[in-house]
A protein has these predicted regions:
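A surface-exposed partner-binding patch
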Residues: 1-71, 137-139
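Glycine-centered flexibility motif
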Residues: 7-10, 22, 72, 86, ...
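Short, surface-exposed beta-strand/loop "edge" segments at domain boundaries and coil↔beta transitions
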Residues: 25, 72-75, 95-102
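Low-complexity, glycine/alanine/valine/leucine- and proline-rich hydrophobic stretches
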Residues: 65, 75-85, 89-94
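Compact, glycine/acidic-enriched structural inserts
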Residues: 90-123
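Charge-dense, low-complexity intrinsically disordered regions
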Residues: 127-139
Length: 139
């Protein structure tokens, strides 16, 4: 939640998108993106979610999508505990693989940008040496 308060909606390194409720662009609206994600997952078994620690066992309909990538990967909160501490699951496009991050969304983004959190299905050139944020990188 601090992530949205600090940056708002937009994109890191023209790859990692951050969503928020009420975003003027429907593609960046957390409610709309979550609705679309849940519809896409409905009736599917996401086997890699079995790797999410037992404390966070969830079904896809419980996830809240707070971010995504240009490759259609999904960053979703696992809504367990206090909202500011919700962990994240990063789901590869096509629901092939998933990576769990026990930190908040802010900690997850920081880990991705400083290299302490590696996602094997993210491009090798992400992040840039000097990551940049843009509210509208394609304007």
């Amino acid at each position: 939640m601090r992530l949205i308060a600090t940056y708002g909606t937009g994109c890191f390194d023209e790859f990692l998108w951050i969503f928020a409720a009420g975003a003027p662009n429907a593609h960046l609206d957390i409610v709309e993106r979550t609705r679309l994600m849940r519809a896409a997952f409905r009736g599917k078994v996401l086997h890699d979610l079995n790797h999410v620690p037992d404390d966070y066992r969830i079904v896809p309909d419980e996830l809240v999508q707070w971010g995504g990538t240009d490759n259609a990967d999904i960053l979703a909160w696992i809504p367990k505990g206090e909202p500011g501490d919700w962990p994240t699951v990063i789901i590869q496009a096509g629901q092939l693989k998933a990576v769990f991050s026990s930190g908040s969304s802010t900690a997850t983004v920081l880990g991705l940008l400083d290299g302490s959190l590696r996602v094997p299905f993210f491009p090798s050139d992400f992040p840039d040496i000097r990551p940049e944020f843009s509210a509208n990188p394609y304007a």
